[in-house]
Structures are given as C-alpha cells and as structure tokens.
C-alpha cells in the first residue's frame, strides 16, 4: 500500500489503529466491525465472503517501507524519519540476477495475510483495502500458495515448484536463542532496536520460472542445479539431507 500524499500523522495513526482492530477480529473468526450492520441504507462493515467460515490459522503481518519514513525528496512525511533503520535508508540488499520492476517494488506499508484457506486471505486484504480507501491505495499485490516453511525439526521440509525440498538449513525453533537473535529478530542494541526490537525484515521476490524447459531437463541436470538429490533432498555427495549443499 501507498499512503496518500498529504495525509497527516494523525490520519496514519487512525488508519493503523482501525487496521489493528479489524485484524484482531478477522484472526478470531469474527466479522469486521462486530455484528452485521442492520441499516440497509449503509454499506456493510464486512464484505461478507467469509461469513460463517473459520479463520483457518489466519495471521496478518504489517511492515513499513522506507518511503513511509521519508518522501522522495527526503521530507519527513509523518515525523518518524529519525526512526528509519539504516538498512532501509541505504536500501535492502540485492540478489545476483535481480531484475526489479518499479510496478512490483517498494511501497509505504506491506500487509501479508496467511491462512490455510485462500479465501480467508483474500477477505482479509480486501477488507483492509476497503478500510484504507481514501488514505491508502494498493501499489501491488501477489497471491500465493504452498505449505508453510518448516520451522521445527519435527516438520518435513516442504518442496518448491521445481520439485526440490526447499529450506532444509533454515533456522529452527530448536536452535539456540542466540541463533534466532542473530539471524531473525532485531535486538535492543541493533539499529532501530529502540522501537523495532523483536521485529524483523521482509524481502519478497517474484521468481520467473520457465517450467516447460525445466520439466524436460534430465534428472541429473536438475540435481546438479540444486546440488541435491531430488527425492530425498540430501547433497549429492552426502547421505544426510541436513548436510551442507554441494556448490
């Protein structure tokens, strides 16, 4: 989402407060605004496509982009420029091969809705967009699906659309807290830690897959691309799936 130019800090605060309330209601399986509006001459407070549905594990995550802290000319849009972490000010790291397009990049506020029911996700984002009408506009959106990434050694590593296990060496909840604190959570002493402590950063990428070419590669070529066995996920030179991958 982008916040309208000229919007005040008070308007931004009011929007985030209303979004928070609506998110709490939707994650609890309730209608936005509570009971349905009985006034037939007024617009419903909830769009209704999940009426009677369970939230199915709905979570809603919010993040702030660099442009929320400072405008294109460096202006302090909402009085929070001094709170911008250096990582946002200097720009998020780029991946080799990135071909970022302006229409799919950046934004003032990002909203991620996750659920075991895609209609619940769509309902959540739709209602937040409805609430923000006049204060925010949708900059870009992306629907997705897939098993959740494995966050515990008790879970099977999920597969990506190339057919390979993806995330074998990700941090797990059983890892020492020091590992999570170093690689995942912002700490009190970190840049921005005075307000971002316990939070994290999000980088999102849309991957262009030439599936029709990939699907016709020999198995050996596919496995050498990832350095892992396609069936079991182990590195080609090791029997253990959790061993470091072959480079």
Outline where the language-model segments fall.
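Long, histidine/aromatic-enriched segments associated with O2/redox biology
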Residues: 1-247
């Amino acid at each position: 989402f982008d916040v309208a130019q000229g919007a005040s800090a008070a308007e931004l605060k009011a929007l985030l407060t209303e979004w928070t309330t609506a998110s709490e209601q939707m994650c609890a399986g309730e209608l936005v605004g509570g009971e349905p509006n009985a006034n037939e001459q007024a617009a419903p407070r909830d769009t209704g496509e999940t009426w009677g549905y369970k939230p199915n594990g709905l979570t809603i995550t919010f993040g702030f982009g660099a442009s929320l802290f400072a405008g294109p000319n460096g202006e302090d849009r909402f009085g929070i420029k001094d709170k911008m972490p250096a990582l946002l000010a200097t720009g998020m790291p780029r991946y080799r091969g990135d071909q970022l397009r302006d229409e799919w990049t950046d934004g003032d506020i990002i909203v991620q809705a996750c659920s075991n029911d895609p209609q619940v996700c769509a309902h959540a984002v739709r209602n937040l967009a409805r609430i923000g009408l006049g204060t925010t506009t949708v900059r870009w959106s992306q629907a997705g699906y897939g098993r959740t990434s494995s966050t515990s050694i008790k879970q099977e590593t999920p597969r990506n659309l190339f057919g390979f296990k993806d995330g074998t060496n990700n941090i797990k909840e059983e890892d020492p807290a020091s590992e999570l604190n170093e690689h995942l959570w912002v700490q009190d002493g970190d840049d921005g830690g005075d307000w971002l402590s316990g939070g994290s950063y999000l980088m999102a990428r849309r991957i262009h897959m030439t599936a029709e070419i990939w699907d016709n590669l020999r198995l050996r070529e596919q496995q050498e691309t990832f350095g892992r066995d396609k069936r079991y996920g182990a590195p080609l030179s090791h029997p253990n799936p959790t061993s470091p991958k072959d480079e």
